[in-house]
Swiss-Prot record:
Annotated localization: Cytoplasm
Cofactor: pyridoxal 5'-phosphate
Signal peptide coordinates: none
Organism: Methylobacillus flagellatus (strain ATCC 51484 / DSM 6875 / VKM B-1610 / KT)
GO MF annotations in UniProt: 2 iron, 2 sulfur cluster binding; cysteine desulfurase activity; metal ion binding; pyridoxal phosphate binding
GO terms under cellular component: L-cysteine desulfurase complex
Function (record text): Master enzyme that delivers sulfur to a number of partners involved in Fe-S cluster assembly, tRNA modification or cofactor biosynthesis. Catalyzes the removal of elemental sulfur atoms from cysteine to produce alanine. Functions as a sulfur delivery protein for Fe-S cluster synthesis onto IscU, an Fe-S scaffold assembly protein, as well as other S acceptor proteins.
Residue list for modification N6-(pyridoxal phosphate)lysine: 207
The family this protein is said to belong to: Belongs to the class-V pyridoxal-phosphate-dependent aminotransferase family. NifS/IscS subfamily.
Protein name from the UniProt record: Cysteine desulfurase IscS
């Protein structure tokens, strides 16, 4: 069987829309085009009903009350609304200190940096070498004036799953608002917001086979969590996020989350088998290092460093497969991955990392093709590397004193 190339193995960057999602969206672009805020006629009522049905589907996936779901333009906006909104609301009574992690997505890191510019203080925790955070270190980072903590559920680069329940319990004890970026988690891990001690949680549709440009923020009702709006005008979404709702996008997100809820368990079994097959094949190559914990990890992610190969040249060499080095949002810069550096990986290994992320439409044939392609291209690139030659000769490269020019 011939494999169609290029092969898409970058599902953590974005996913194709599931055909069932696209089909459900189209009528809301053409026939049911009303504004959900139009209360005086049937076009508006139809749109509003569709929006509320989708809200219920999003809530069902994470076991929340539909009234706790606020529509946004995506997880980046949700992160901004949650962190800035909660910090601004609670800082007068609590203080201006924020705790987060060095391996968070830039949408969290840069939001916290912006608050620092406005007079807040922030602590950026360093994770353990496996990517997980030490709970004692987290607890020690909290202060009497800590207003908010933000820890992602699933890391976008290395796929590790943090112990959100334990972290949330520590926050509850200390009266700290707890925000979780769950953009990479929906449809991959079970989320139960009735049980999890989480106050705010960000979601994205396009990481879960839904459309781009739509996301949501969970805002807890009991105990009630308050946030200050960041977008003003019209008072939509119970005053938390103004702007005409994009009915077709919202319908798409609802359908994507419905499918995720119904098919997640069986899908994860299949995807984990493919991931393990890929890992087994790539481990036959010498000097490969898996980044991040393999146990506490989502099924679809594999992040591997190939020593003595430069990441960018490797990506150019394997043009038949769509993979990434680092996060899609920051891989335009040639800096080594800040996530891998936070784990203590050397610049060389951080630079030689490739993130493979498998998804709903990946086949076994595509995985086998990828393994063969990687083996052949890495072999060729290493033949060109004087460092690889020295390694084969048994030279300890860490002990070499390199001359500067």
């Amino acid at each position: 069987m011939t494999v169609r190339t290029p092969i898409y193995l970058d599902y953590s960057a974005t996913t194709p829309i599931d055909p069932r999602v696209a089909e459900k969206m189209i009528p809301y672009l053409t026939e049911h085009f009303g504004n959900p805020a139009s209360r005086s006629h049937a076009f508006g009522w139809t749109a509003e009903k569709a929006v509320e049905n989708a809200r219920e589907e999003v809530a069902r996936l994470v076991n929340a009350d539909p009234r706790e779901i606020v529509w946004t333009s995506g997880a980046t906006e949700s992160n901004n609304l949650a962190i800035k909104g909660a910090a601004n609301f609670y800082s007068p009574s609590k203080g201006k200190h924020i705790v987060t992690v060095q391996t968070e997505h830039k949408a969290v890191i840069d939001t916290v940096r912006e608050l620092e510019r406005l007079g807040y203080e922030a602590t950026y925790l360093i994770p353990e070498p496996n990517g997980l955070i030490d709970l004692d270190k987290f607890k020690a980072a909290l202060r009497p004036d800590t207003v908010l903590a933000s820890v992602m559920l699933v890391n976008n680069e290395i796929g590790v799953i943090q112990d959100i329940e334990a972290i949330g319990n520590i926050c509850r004890e200390q009266g700290v608002i707890f925000h979780v970026d769950a953009a990479q988690a929906t449809g991959k891990v079970h989320i139960d917001l009735q049980k999890l001690p989480v106050d705010l949680m960000s979601f994205s549709a396009h990481k879960t086979y839904g459309p781009k440009g739509i996301g949501a923020l969970y805002v807890r009702r009991k105990p009630r969590v308050r946030i200050e709006a960041q977008m003003h005008g019209g008072g939509h979404e119970r005053g938390m996020r103004s702007g005409t709702l994009a009915t077709h996008q919202i319908v798409g997100m609802g359908e994507a989350f419905r499918i995720a809820r119904e098919e997640m368990d069986s899908e994860n079994v299949r995807i984990r088998q493919l991931r393990d097959r890929l890992l087994k094949g790539l481990q036959e190559i010498e000097e490969v290092y898996v980044n991040g914990d393999l146990e506490h990890r989502v099924a679809h992610n594999l992040n591997i460093s190939f020593n003595f190969v430069e990441g960018e040249s490797l990506i150019m060499a394997v043009k038949d497969i769509a993979v990434s080095s680092g996060s899609a949002c920051t891989s335009a810069s040639l800096e080594p991955s800040y996530v891998l550096r936070a784990l203590g990986r050397s610049d060389e290994l951080a630079h030689s990392s490739i993130r493979f992320s498998i998804g709903r439409f990946t086949t076994e044939e595509e995985i086998d093709y990828t393994i063969q392609l990687m083996k052949s291209k890495i072999g060729k690139l290493r033949e060109l590397s004087p460092l690889w030659e020295m390694h084969l000769e048994g030279v300890d490269l860490n002990a070499v004193a390199w001359a500067t020019h």
